[in-house]
């Protein structure tokens, strides 16, 4: 049986493209398919990537909920409806590939109840730079002589941000000659590889 993937994005979708390519011509061919792409930003280029690949897309933006219900209640309703949308799609796995919203218990508990796993890609090593601006913070730490390596990981999503159990971890050296742009490029290259590997590993483990 081919595993169905729902991919959550917020931006350019380069990691989404890596998954699509792997399902068409790589290690995921014949074992997984991206069946839906959901974005929280209408201008996310990843929506175009999905459309070009013939993958259905949808938009789920937070602002209308905040306007109607206020920030706190609006966010809870937004998250609850996000969970409903995902559950209706009945995916084998949900993949956060550059999704820039923290997933609250309002999302995670319904998914867990429906036995839908969710994984996230984070551009840092486990426990090193949780949260936002991880690459920038790692670069700054290297400039101060505190670290010589950073990395990327794919992990199971839990309520604590970027603290779920790692599935695959890849170290990335930080050279003294690296610019922030060079480091970003190295980390993104590692991300594209390990995200596909993690999906393959999960599917294999569940067979």
Curated annotation (Swiss-Prot):
Active site as annotated: 122
GO CC, any one term: cytoplasm
Catalytic activity line of the entry: N(1)-(5-phospho-beta-D-ribosyl)glycinamide + (6R)-10-formyltetrahydrofolate = N(2)-formyl-N(1)-(5-phospho-beta-D-ribosyl)glycinamide + (6S)-5,6,7,8-tetrahydrofolate + H(+)
Entry binding sites for N(1)-(5-phospho-beta-D-ribosyl)glycinamide: 13-15, 191
One Pfam match: Formyl_trans_N
EC number(s) per entry: 2.1.2.2
Keywords carried by this UniProt record: Purine biosynthesis, Transferase
Recorded GO MF terms: phosphoribosylglycinamide formyltransferase activity
GO biological process, one term: adenine biosynthetic process
Annotated metabolic or biological route of this protein: Purine metabolism; IMP biosynthesis via de novo pathway; N(2)-formyl-N(1)-(5-phospho-D-ribosyl)glycinamide from N(1)-(5-phospho-D-ribosyl)glycinamide (10-formyl THF route): step 1/1
Entry binding sites for (6R)-10-formyltetrahydrofolate: 100-103, 120, 162
KW Transferase (keyword) present: yes
Highest taxon in the source lineage: Eukaryota
Site description Raises pKa of active site His, residues in chain: 162
Family recorded in the similarity comment: Belongs to the GART family.
Name of the protein: Phosphoribosylglycinamide formyltransferase
């Amino acid at each position: 049986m081919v595993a169905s993937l729902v991919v959550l994005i917020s931006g350019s979708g380069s990691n989404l493209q890596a998954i699509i390519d792997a399902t068409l011509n790589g290690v995921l061919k014949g074992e997984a398919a991206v069946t839906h792409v959901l974005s929280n930003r209408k201008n996310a280029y990843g929506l175009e990537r999905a459309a070009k690949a013939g993958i259905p897309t949808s938009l789920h933006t937070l602002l209308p909920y905040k306007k109607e219900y206020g920030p706190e209640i609006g966010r809870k309703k937004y998250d609850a409806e996000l969970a409903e949308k995902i559950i209706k799609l009945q995916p084998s796995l949900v993949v956060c590939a550059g999704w820039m919203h923290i997933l609250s218990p309002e999302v995670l508990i319904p998914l867990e109840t429906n036995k839908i796993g969710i994984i996230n890609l984070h551009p840092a090593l486990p426990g090193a730079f949780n949260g936002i601006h991880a690459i920038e913070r790692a670069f700054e730490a290297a400039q101060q002589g505190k670290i010589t390596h950073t990395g990327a990981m794919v992990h199971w999503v839990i309520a604590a941000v970027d603290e779920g159990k790692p599935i695959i971890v890849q170290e990335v050296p930080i050279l003294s000659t690296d610019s922030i742009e060079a480091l970003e490029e190295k980390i993104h290259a590692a991300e594209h590889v390990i995200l596909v590997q993690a999906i393959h590993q999960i599917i294999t483990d569940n067979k």
